């Protein structure tokens, strides 16, 4: 057995866009299947408005959700979310492969030698921007479906029609700017943290699931730094539904600070880390494993 498992995300890794797209889609689908309920709870926490006598805890939200909407409500918005994760995973890792090669060429042309971690930070930011542009409508749709507190489940097509009817085509991209900032920052920091963790774990490559452990650390680190941007993104996605007219991201940011304080930017932080860290762990592990498996099949053929 090799003492060092291959890191397919490291600077200089020879991964084709097609390989990365397929492995990334598999990783996205599997990670979503395990973390859907945590995502629902996290978004409900983030969307709590000011005005409750008592802020609802995670336990209270879960209890109310099960009593009033049934256990299936934990998977509200899961169909668009599964599509989102499959698309996002494929586009994220596929674009990562393409951008990584482009950045490496620029480094060679301008005689720059970035560390593997800093290389991954830049590439990750780029892949986050591309992935957000492609998959954002599904992210918004997921948020709208999860925010629905009626026992009956809204349909995807019905929700899309309502958004277009009430808000126009632009409504499908409500909150895209803070989303771009949030996702690109989180993605860049995740890949940066992952590469740092992989470098520090060089002497522990025989540890089972070392990729998942490094992915868990990366997910927790990136989310801890960028969580306020994620809250702002969710509020922007819901503002036109709640208030009937669009607000700018800066207006919503100031309103949160004024009415809820800094704490308002961190609503749902605990459950978010509990969801994001395992998601990153599963996603990065499955990407590495799926890519190795795809290559083994090709060798056998």
Curated annotation (Swiss-Prot):
Q: According to its UniProt record, where is this protein located?
A: Mitochondrion inner membrane
Can you tell which superkingdom this protein's organism belongs to? Eukaryota
Q: How does it sit in the membrane?
A: Multi-pass membrane protein
InterPro entries linked: Mit_carrier, Mitochondrial_sb/sol_carrier, Mt_carrier_dom_sf
GO BP annotations of the record are:
mitochondrial thiamine pyrophosphate transmembrane transport; thiamine pyrophosphate transmembrane transport
Q: Could you confirm whether the keyword S-adenosyl-L-methionine appears in this record? A: no
For this protein, what is any one GO molecular function term? Answer: thiamine pyrophosphate transmembrane transporter activity
Q: Write out the entry's keywords from A to Z.
A: Membrane, Mitochondrion, Mitochondrion inner membrane, Repeat, Transmembrane, Transmembrane helix, Transport
Its transmembrane ranges are: 20-38, 79-99, 121-141, 172-192, 207-227, 252-272
Solcar repeat boundaries on the chain = 15-102, 115-200, 206-293
Q: Which Gene3D superfamilies match?
A: Mitochondrial carrier domain
CC per GO annotation:
mitochondrial inner membrane
PROSITE patterns to which the protein is assigned, alphabetical = SOLCAR (PS50920)
Family per record: Belongs to the mitochondrial carrier (TC 2.A.29) family.
Biological role stated in the UniProt entry: Mitochondrial transporter that mediates uptake of thiamine pyrophosphate (ThPP) into mitochondria.
Q: What is this protein called?
A: Mitochondrial thiamine pyrophosphate carrier 1
What phylogenetic lineage does the species belong to?
A: Eukaryota, Fungi, Dikarya, Ascomycota, Saccharomycotina
Which gene name belongs to this protein?
Answer: TPC1
